[in-house]
């Protein structure tokens, strides 16, 4: 790990961040000669990692440094915010020493690797539930981002950003679009499937000013100060020097209601607190359920040509309550163009909840008379606790089907018939027919009709089913053939 203070001194400058500073003496607040000196230089990385510092001393120094970080005026505000009210959870000196030694092997120029390492730590935390809510699997984030396909001029929001996974994936997806080596036009889902990345230098076709403007386009809200802190760190490690992450109650506060965006990506909390949410009066749908309010919020905060992808629990799809039906009616009539059903177990091992993805685009929704339904049975991983990779994943096929549907949707109200193993189209009129606007795709799937004079029966009624053994000689005919 580079010690920037040490490098500054070696180049003839002065230590800036981990340097001693003065604060007024409470008894003599107006007498600068009596200011107290706070010794912060002893916490500099070079001194902390000195070979003569024991593990116990390191634990003490590191704990003191974290506790004093937010008070040091020499530390940039971003980091003071990150370390506000934090503490060191590691109490074993040798464990901390090993951890810091590993971190010390990174260089500042390795920010991408450091960011990837941090995201790995977040995934481990998520599987253990340490951060208070489970996280969206990386491949599902990338899948959703690849579908929405944000570009460099889009303003992008995650209204329940957690650790900023959607924002970082969208950022990398955009960089890929402007990478010289990306001759295949890989999207972020395809790129991240490679264990060894096919190329680096993402975004090398963007000018420095373009990158600065791009970074300012990303915005995240979260009600949890811990999640905000994790987002700030994660984004900083991915090149965001001043991330636009705000501790904000998306559903109860009106302060940012008038903001709108070109792209919204989200996996908001599914659970409502006891007694429900107490939202303000600006929502179109009257409800105290968080999943209803978040979908309403996203739909209402898209720009006229905006598009969104949101992961929702099954209640949004078919619940019969008035608020759920009103929400689905609003979506079908004004916002929704596709529904992707995900298999139960996508969020294993920390939740077996069944979810779907709602895809919104006002422009397409106004032109289309149909909604596209896709059912994913295989997301590329088994549905056990460990979620190991398996063959036959359907996500890439789904991306292609959706993109083809969107391309046609900008020109025509209806499409050539789509009826594949995983996708089919349903007229909006059929969805609206019984008034509940149910978004379960299987409900509208064409039933196979068989023209035959013979009744359909189970195989075991007309044949003996033998399994689990090798054929015996009596099963063969006179010629010895089966």
What annotation goes with each model-predicted range?
Residues 355-359, 373, 436:
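Conserved hydrophobic/aromatic beta-strand scaffold that supports enzyme active sites
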Residues 406-407, 412-413, 417-472:
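Non-catalytic DNA-recognition/assembly elements of restriction-modification systems
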Residues 130-266, 271-273, 279-282, 288, ...:
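Conserved S-adenosyl-L-methionine
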Residues 163, 252, 269-272, 314-317, ...:
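Conserved nucleotide-binding/hydrolysis micro-motifs of P-loop NTPases
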Residues 223, 228, 288-360:
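Conserved Class I SAM-dependent methyltransferase catalytic core
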Residues 5-125:
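Long recognition/docking surfaces used for binding and targeting
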Residues 374, 392-405, 472-482:
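Short, intrinsically disordered, charge-balanced linker/junction segments flanking boundaries
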Residues 261-267, 299, 460-482:
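DNA target-recognition domains and sequence-specific DNA-contacting regions of bacterial/archaeal
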């Amino acid at each position: 790990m580079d010690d920037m203070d040490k490098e500054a001194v070696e180049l003839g400058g002065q230590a800036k961040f981990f340097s001693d500073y003065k604060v007024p003496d409470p008894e003599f607040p107006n007498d600068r000669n009596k200011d107290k000196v706070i010794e912060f230089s002893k916490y500099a990385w070079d001194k902390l990692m000195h070979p003569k510092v024991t593990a116990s001393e390191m634990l003490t120094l590191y704990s003191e440094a974290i506790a004093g970080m937010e008070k040091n005026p020499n530390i940039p505000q971003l980091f003071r915010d990150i370390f506000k009210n934090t503490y060191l959870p590691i109490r074993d000196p040798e464990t901390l020493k090993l951890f810091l030694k590993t971190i010390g092997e990174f260089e500042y120029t390795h920010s991408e690797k450091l960011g990837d390492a941090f995201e790995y730590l977040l995934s481990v935390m998520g599987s253990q539930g340490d951060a208070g809510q489970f996280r969206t699997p990386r491949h599902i984030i990338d899948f959703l981002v690849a579908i929405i396909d944000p570009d460099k001029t889009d303003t992008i929001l995650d209204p329940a950003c957690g650790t900023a996974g959607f924002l970082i994936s969208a950022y990398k997806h955009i960089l890929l679009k402007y990478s010289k080596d990306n001759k295949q036009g890989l999207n972020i889902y395809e790129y991240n499937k490679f264990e060894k990345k096919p190329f680096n230098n993402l975004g090398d076709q963007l000018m420095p000013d373009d990158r600065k403007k791009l970074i300012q386009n990303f915005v995240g809200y979260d009600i949890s100060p811990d999640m905000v802190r994790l987002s700030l760190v994660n984004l900083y490690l991915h090149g965001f020097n001043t991330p636009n992450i705000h501790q904000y109650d998306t559903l109860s506060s009106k302060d940012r209601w008038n903001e709108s965006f070109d792209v919204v990506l989200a996996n908001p909390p599914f659970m409502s607190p006891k007694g429900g949410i107490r939202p303000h009066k600006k929502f179109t749908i009257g409800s105290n359920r968080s999943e209803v309010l978040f979908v309403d919020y996203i739909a209402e905060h898209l720009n006229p040509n905006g598009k969104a992808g949101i992961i929702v629990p099954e209640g949004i799809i078919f619940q019969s309550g008035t608020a759920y039906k009103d929400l689905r009616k609003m979506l079908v009539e004004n916002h929704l163009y596709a529904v992707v059903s995900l298999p139960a177990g996508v969020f294993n091992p920390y939740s077996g909840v069944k979810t779907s993805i709602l895809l919104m685009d006002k422009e397409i929704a106004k032109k289309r008379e149909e909604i596209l339904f896709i059912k994913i049975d295989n997301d590329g991983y088994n549905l056990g606790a460990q979620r190991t990779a398996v063959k036959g994943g359907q996500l890439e096929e789904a991306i292609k089907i959706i993109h083809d549907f969107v391309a046609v949707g900008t020109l025509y109200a209806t499409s050539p018939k789509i009826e594949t193993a995983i996708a089919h189209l349903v007229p909006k009129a059929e969805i609206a027919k019984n008034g509940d606007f149910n978004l379960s795709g299987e409900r509208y799937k064409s039933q196979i009709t068989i023209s035959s004079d013979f009744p359909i029966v189970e195989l075991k009624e007309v044949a003996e089913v033998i399994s689990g053994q090798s054929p015996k000689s009596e099963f063969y005919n006179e010629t010895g053939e089966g």
